[in-house]
Amino acid sequence: IDSEKVFGFKSNMKILGFKEKTKFVPEIDDSYLFDEITTKAILAGFCYNRRVMIQGYHGTGKSTHIEQVAARLNWPCVRVNLDSHISRLDLVGKDAIVLKDGKQITEFREGVLPWALQNPVAIVFDEYDAGRADVMFVIQRVLEVSGKLTLLDNNRVINPHQNFRLFA
C-alpha cells in the first residue's frame, strides 16, 4: 500500500493489507484526516505485530483513528468498550444452556477475545483506563510476548492468529 497516496505521508514501512473487504472491516470515511505520528504508530502495530496504545483525552477520536487505518488496509476490526459493564466472562466466554438434538445441555461459548485471537482481526479496547481489574488481568496475558490465552473453563490454550492485532 502506498502510504503517501492512502495516508498523505511517506513511510519506509512495508504496508500490507487484505485484498477483500469482509463484514468486520470498518467503513472508510473519505473526509478523515490522518495525524502522521499517530498513524505511523498504528501502522507499526499492523505491520510488525506490535501492541499499540494510543493515549489522549476522552472523545478525541483515538479508536476512530485506528478504525480508519484498518479500513484502508481492509483489516477486520472490532471495538470493545471496556466500560464497567463488560466482565471477564463477556471477554473470555461462559457456559450457556443450548438446545442440541432437542435436549438442553450446557456448552461453553467463547467470548470476543478468544474469537478475535483465532482470526485475522484487530481488536480495539476502547476506554482502556475504565476496565475492571478482572478484565484487565485477562488482557494482560494477551499483551505478553507469546500472546497466548489459556481458557481454563475448557482446558485450552489459544495461540494468536498470525494476523491478530491488538490496540487500546
Annotate each language-model stretch with its function.
Residues I1-A168:
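AAA+ P-loop NTPase catalytic core and its hallmark functional loops
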